[in-house]
A protein has these predicted regions:
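Feature marking well-ordered beta-strand scaffolds used for ligand recognition
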Residues: 1-122
Length: 122
């Protein structure tokens, strides 16, 4: 799903599949983000999806209602503020699993960012 923003235009798109039957995966939901940046590595921790969004930086998406096909961005940290174009610059990966709540963002251009959310409510 990494090249759809370049080849087809449009916003960041995340495809959510129901894998309850491994022999018969079903497309459950399509989430369209708020930028045209390319989505890359994403990780779920609790009810949040932490997404490296290249030029869009880190995006934090609430997936608490994913079963009802509802996902919504609740925060972001832009490591590449000059633009949100669909190209391979900015945040390549994130790591939200530190017990301290710190989130590591690996940025291709600017190196390592360590951030911590003030409030993780909806």
């Amino acid at each position: 799903d990494e090249l759809d923003e370049i080849n087809m235009g449009g916003p960041t798109r995340t495809l959510v599949f129901d894998l309850s039957e491994l022999d018969n995966p079903q497309l459950h939901h399509v989430y369209n983000g708020v930028t045209r940046a390319i989505d890359h590595n994403g990780y779920i921790k609790d009810e949040f999806y932490y997404l490296a969004n290249y030029t869009g930086g880190l995006r934090v998406i609430n997936v608490n209602e994913i079963g009802n096909e509802r996902m919504g961005e609740i925060g972001f940290f832009d490591t590449y503020p000059s633009d949100d174009k669909a190209n391979f610059a900015g945040a390549w990966s994130v790591y939200p699993f530190f017990e301290s709540g710190i989130i590591a963002i690996n940025d291709i251009n600017s190196g390592l960012f360590l951030v911590k959310a003030k409030n993780m409510e909806n």
